[in-house]
Amino acid sequence: MADDWESAADSEVVIRPTAAASVNKWEGEDEDEDIKDSWEDEEEKKDEEKPTKTEAPAKPKPNKALKAKLEQQARLEEEAEAQRVASLSPAEKLAEKLRLQKIQEASDLKHAQEAFGVTSTCGGLDAFNPESKEEFKEFGATLSWKVAQFRESEHFPQFVEDLVRSLCVNLSAADIKKVKMNVEILHSEKLKLEKANAKKPAGKGKGKVTLRTENDDIDGYQKYGNDFTEDYDDFM
């Protein structure tokens, strides 16, 4: 009987299949999204790293009409100036020549000041502070050049005489003697030159004889008036 029960119990045992592990159908979806996002980020970075092409500004085309107009205006001004000069009287032409000469002298003075380091026109000669022998030569050359601009005045000879006297007051007797000797030598040379020029017949095409001093080499910027300023360079 006991064997029958055991057999019946064994026959009633049912072996059920093991339940399959639950599978999440959304599993791995997040990973796909992460991969997709990383691709998009890389694409954005590549787009940012690409150099942006800047278009070069278009070069302005030359205005041919304006250029031609300016050239025509300049040509008309030159023609008008030529006609004006041609219509001047001899006296007016001389005055015009003197005016242009003064302009040139002013330009030469400006270049001389720049060469000597005098950049401020307000300071003028006061801007000089000579200490060495060469600096005093430069100062004297500039001073004599400036003074010589007034050589056409009838008061110029008296002015020079007074200037020399006032300068010599500050010298010793020995130094004044040296100045006197230089002036006498200069006076003698001037007499010889004046006599030589007076004896030469006019119209021979030879230039006037002038006195040359060492300052002509030192002060090459003096385009005008060397024959006047050299009279005073040796003792100024």
Swiss-Prot record:
GO molecular function, one term: translation initiation factor activity
Gene3D superfamilies, sorted: Eukaryotic translation initiation factor 3 like domains
Major location category of this protein: cytoplasm
Subunit organization: Component of the eukaryotic translation initiation factor 3 (eIF-3) complex. The eIF-3 complex interacts with pix.
InterPro entries recorded: eIF3-like_dom_sf (IPR023194), eIF3j (IPR013906)
Alphabetical UniProt keywords: Cytoplasm, Initiation factor, Protein biosynthesis
Coiled coil: none
Localization terms from the record: Cytoplasm
Region (Disordered): 1-88
Pfam family, one: eIF3_subunit
Annotated Gene Ontology cellular component terms: eukaryotic 43S preinitiation complex; eukaryotic 48S preinitiation complex; eukaryotic translation initiation factor 3 complex
Name this protein carries in UniProt: Eukaryotic translation initiation factor 3 subunit J
The organism of origin for this protein: Drosophila erecta (Fruit fly)
Taxon lineage: Eukaryota, Metazoa, Ecdysozoa, Arthropoda, Hexapoda
Free-text function comment from the UniProt entry: Component of the eukaryotic translation initiation factor 3 (eIF-3) complex, which is involved in protein synthesis of a specialized repertoire of mRNAs and, together with other initiation factors, stimulates binding of mRNA and methionyl-tRNAi to the 40S ribosome. The eIF-3 complex specifically targets and initiates translation of a subset of mRNAs involved in cell proliferation.
GO biological process: formation of cytoplasmic translation initiation complex; regulation of translational initiation
KW Protein biosynthesis (keyword) present: yes
Gene behind this protein: eIF3j
Family: Belongs to the eIF-3 subunit J family.
TM annotation in the entry: none
Stretches with biased composition (Acidic residues): 28-46
Amino acid composition bias (Basic and acidic residues), ranges on this chain: 47-58, 68-77
